[in-house]
């Protein structure tokens, strides 16, 4: 294999391992287990992972667990810190507390108190439910007007079960408003294979990090495309299945600058309706082509995995 082919192969292997890490943060993730995912020796995989990602594998796993815990501290303020630590793969609360303070410079409790999410009682967000809607069951759909900073956003909000959804993706690392290159690579790969013109195909972004927690340069997100069946991928193009289950789904009609507020509003609505975030994929799926919208806005579904309190 030439150098370019080798690099593509390594990229594919690393992405497969990262996909496994993201889906199994609550389980053992040592070097031996992870290198076995791609049939490489622990020593060899450790070298190529560190070179590609800029940090050793063990440090990457610990950081991901800590940042996942930090997100849960904010989005699930009533969940005990011990429960969050165990859910994120720490088998000792003392190890979790020591690592958390080393990474964030404060205790988990202080971090939770300092960084109030919008769903706290001091929230700048306010939601107004359309009273013409009826609640038929614990699975409901309601129209909402979100008020923040003197501006309003309309959305429909629903708690519902979503089926698993296979996707192909191109991974992006860095600022979340710079994902155009990843989408361009995805489309360039998918178009000649006839995947772009499949009826019902949707584009989406899957977010693996919370921008309020993870530094901008390490943010990871996937530019994705729905597919109906398993596709043979290669190099930077990978595939996995979006987790099914109970989701909070909010449909917004918004401009690019309104996406952060829409996400914060969704977390506010999740808490308002007696739910909390849980493990699973957080993503937005695009329902239109913004270039065809008269105001150049996106019609987007924001999907957050949840469970009832």
What are these regions (language model features)?
Residues 26, 40, 51-54, 66, ...:
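Short helix-loop boundary/capping segments at the starts of domains
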Residues 1-5, 16, 28-64, 85-107:
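Basic/polar phosphate-binding segments, predominantly the helix-turn-helix DNA-binding elements
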Residues 19-22, 39, 187, 191:
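Short amphipathic alpha-helical segments enriched in leucine
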Residues 24, 35, 74, 86, ...:
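Short, flexible active-site loop motifs that bind/organize anionic cofactors or intermediates
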Residues 2-29, 62-79:
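A short, Lys/Arg-enriched amphipathic alpha-helix from helix-turn-helix/homeodomain DNA-binding modules
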